[in-house]
Every structure is written in C-alpha cells, then in structure tokens.
C-alpha cells in the first residue's frame, strides 16, 4: 500500500447549461487513480511536480480532449479516499474553451459527450458526482 496523498484535478467545462463528460472505458485498467470503469467523468488527472493547478487543468484537458480551456476558477476541493488510495481533488470550472473535441486517450476514455446539467447519465464517476451535486446545490 502506498501511503501518499496525491493531488488530482477535475475540470468542469461549461457551455451554456451543458458540461463535457468522458466515458471511462469498460476495459480500463487501474492507472493509479480511483478505479471506476464504465462511468462518466470530467477531464483531469494528477498534478505534476512544479505545475500549478491551472497549468495541470489546461494540460490534462488538452491531452484528453484536444480542447484549450481558459477563464478558469477553483470551485472546490474534496478528499477522495478509496481502495487504499487518497486523492485531494481540486475541482476547477473552465468558462471558455476552443478547439475540436477529440478522443485523445482511447485506452482511458472512449467517448466525450456534452450533457445537459439536468439530464446527466446515472453512472457518474463518484468524484464527478460529488462535484456536480455541490455545483447544483450552490446554483
């Protein structure tokens, strides 16, 4: 067991009343994060050494979706503890984006799709569900 807290970044990209979610592959192997295949998640992953949270958010979104994001704000932070893993997840909202949406890491997410905030899939990745629930409660 690894006794280390890691920092993860989750990015809600907003477009009107829609948010971008990626489908985590059913065959996805545990890549070090919290293991929940066949769920829908926001883009984002681990922060790297010497990288700000906004740099991480921009890098991860670009690596995963091919989108460039801007006008970022920190929304919340949460402790995500599962299966002997502990992540502090920084939840970031991106209010602007540009580029052509594309699946960049098909071994991790096999689809990216825009969902209305009031019509989300049931099988949300647990940290994503927490993020959305908190966001909707504050609106």
Set out the residue ranges of the language-model regions.
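N-terminal strand-loop-strand
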Residues: 1-41, 69
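The catalytic Nudix box helix
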Residues: 42-76, 92
